[in-house]
């Protein structure tokens, strides 16, 4: 028995063949997001993508947008600062109904979070087994079946680590813009360079374009800015390494629910500005950076 056998194809949809959901074209999936603007958030593992995604979703909602955030990580902690709890995953809920999606209602797997942000956690198979990308693909199908992607202004995909192969690249097939979360250090920038290459490859056949990067948990931005200048890329936000952001995670809240300390107010303003920048970016030509070779990055940022 394959480790993936515990996650069968969703009944009620055309069969795709084992594992094929993760590499299908968007036309095959038939995803219709209506007029929603779709953003995929990528970055090195542990860089703060979920914190960035949740506060970005909150900022969009405060700008009057209807927002849906989709966590694409087996840890299923993408949305807990929006909802105040760890949300049950789509895959676990499907198991409860023996993988009969027609028995589910949106409220069975969608939780309303801060300021009306709708939250979904795709989940994933146990560690070391199955295909997480397959789970993401099936979640997208379920959202399509219930027309949830059509009834929003903004969709935010919070994607696992810096994995941009197969299924975890699937959000790029539907995204208008990809946002990369990085930090002012070599490893984070190295991961960003590889993500840029993956997004550029997808952009040949899909509408996705790069929006820019966020320098996160960083006092300075000099290394990020040096890379951006060399690769013709752009930093569009800077989130310093603030203790208030760490405390908000511990309190299971977005920054917009914290007390009005000076650093909190500053961070909120930066997230609002980021949301406004991303919203405008979909009506403008996307960035077209040139990813650097490994040797070039080492020479640019590595040790002397």
Curated annotation (Swiss-Prot):
Binding residues for [4Fe-4S] cluster: 131, 165
Q: Which GO terms describe its molecular function?
A: 4 iron, 4 sulfur cluster binding; ATP binding; metal ion binding; oxidoreductase activity, acting on iron-sulfur proteins as donors; oxidoreductase activity, acting on the CH-CH group of donors, iron-sulfur protein as acceptor
- Gene that encodes it: bchL
Protein name (database record)? Light-independent protochlorophyllide reductase iron-sulfur ATP-binding protein
State the Gene3D superfamilies in the record. Answer: P-loop containing nucleotide triphosphate hydrolases
Give the organism the record lists.
Rhodobacter capsulatus (strain ATCC BAA-309 / NBRC 16581 / SB1003)
| Cofactors (names) | [4Fe-4S] cluster
The Gene Ontology biological process terms listed for this entry are: light-independent bacteriochlorophyll biosynthetic process; photosynthesis, dark reaction
Summarize where Mg(2+) binds, as residue positions: 50
Enzymatic reactions: chlorophyllide a + oxidized 2[4Fe-4S]-[ferredoxin] + 2 ADP + 2 phosphate = protochlorophyllide a + reduced 2[4Fe-4S]-[ferredoxin] + 2 ATP + 2 H2O
Q: Which residues bind ATP?
A: 46-51, 75, 216-217, 240-242
- Could you tell me what the cofactor note in this record states? Binds 1 [4Fe-4S] cluster per dimer.
The protein's UniProt keywords, in alphabetical order, are:
4Fe-4S, ATP-binding, Bacteriochlorophyll biosynthesis, Chlorophyll biosynthesis, Iron, Iron-sulfur, Magnesium, Metal-binding, Nucleotide-binding, Oxidoreductase, Photosynthesis
Q: Which residues form the signal peptide?
A: none
Which EC number(s) does the record attach to this protein? 1.3.7.7
Outline what the protein does: Component of the dark-operative protochlorophyllide reductase (DPOR) that uses Mg-ATP and reduced ferredoxin to reduce ring D of protochlorophyllide (Pchlide) to form chlorophyllide a (Chlide). This reaction is light-independent. The L component serves as a unique electron donor to the NB-component of the complex, and binds Mg-ATP.
Matches recorded under NCBIfam families: DPOR_bchL
| InterPro entries the record matches | NifH/chlL_CS (IPR030655), NifH/frxC (IPR000392), P-loop_NTPase (IPR027417), Protochlorophyllide_ATP-bd (IPR005971)
Which Pfam families does the entry link to? Fer4_NifH
How this chain assembles, per its entry, is: Homodimer. Protochlorophyllide reductase is composed of three subunits; BchL, BchN and BchB.
Report the family membership.
Belongs to the NifH/BchL/ChlL family.
Q: What class of enzyme is it?
A: oxidoreductase
Pathway-wise, it operates in: Porphyrin-containing compound metabolism; bacteriochlorophyll biosynthesis (light-independent)
